Amino acid sequence: MKSIKLISFLDIKNDSLVTNKLKKDNTVFLKQGSLDGACGPYCLFMTLIILGLIDYDHAINLWWTKRNSKFGKMVYKMQEHGTLFQKGTHLKQLKVLLEYSFQSKLELNVSKEKGKRLINFCIEQLKQNKPTIIGINGSDLSHWLLAVGFEKNEKGEVSKLFFLDPSGNDIPNYWNATIEVKKKHRGRYPYSWIDFAEDRFVNLEDGISLGLK
C-alpha cells in the first residue's frame, strides 16, 4: 500500500497551510513575485515560519523588521544582493544568510550532490523532520523548491518528493509541486516534474536542510 510522509509541523486550517509551531499568524505559503529571482529566500522564509522562528507577518513585512533581530540581520544581509535577487541565489548565499542570522537556533546540513545522491539526502532529512531546500535545474529552468514530504510506493520505495514551490499556486494542501524520483529518463534531466499538462524534465542539484537545535 502507498504511504505518505510529511513534516509533522504542518497542518491545514481555515483553507490555508499552517505551522503548528506558532499559535497565530502561522500561514506558511509565500508567493514569489513574477519579476524577482528570490525563490531561494522565499523558501528560507517558509522554512523559518514552519519552524516557528518567524511568523507570516514578519515575512511579508520584511523591510520593516528591526535590524538588531535575527530576521533583521538576514534582511540586512539580503540587501547586499539587491532587493529582488534578480540574478537568483546560490547554495552558498543561502547558507551565508542563515549563518549570519539564525545560526544559534538552527542545525544546517548542506549537500552539493545531485541526482540520486541528493534525493537520498533529501529523504533522510525529511525523515528527521527537517524541511529541505532543493535546487531544480532544467533546460530553461533554475529554481529552488522546499521539500516537505515524500510518497512510498507499494514496495516501500520512495517514488515522489513533495514540495512547496514559491512560484506556484497557493492552495489548501500540504504541497503544490511533485517530482517523480523513482522512474528515471535518459538525458541530463532524468526526473519528471509532474504538475504540468506535459511533464517537465529536471535534475536535482544542491540542497540544504534546516532543523531546530
For each feature predicted by the language model, list its residue ranges.
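Active-site nucleophile-adjacent alpha helix/oxyanion-hole segment immediately C-terminal to the catalytic cysteine
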Residues: 1-77
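Short, well-structured alpha-helical interface segments that form or flank functional binding sites
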Residues: 34, 38, 89, 117, ...
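Generic short alpha-helical segment signal, independent of protein family or function
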Residues: 52, 99, 103, 205-206, ...
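Noncatalytic regulatory segments and standalone regulatory/sensor domains
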Residues: 150-213
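Cysteine-dependent deubiquitinase/ubiquitin-like isopeptidase catalytic cores across multiple families
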Residues: 21-22, 80-121, 127
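Active-site-adjacent substructure of cysteine-protease-like catalytic cores
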Residues: 110-164
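Short, electropositive, low-hydrophobicity segments enriched in small/polar residues
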Residues: 41-44, 92, 139, 153
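Secondary-structure boundary/capping signal
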Residues: 55-56, 106, 155
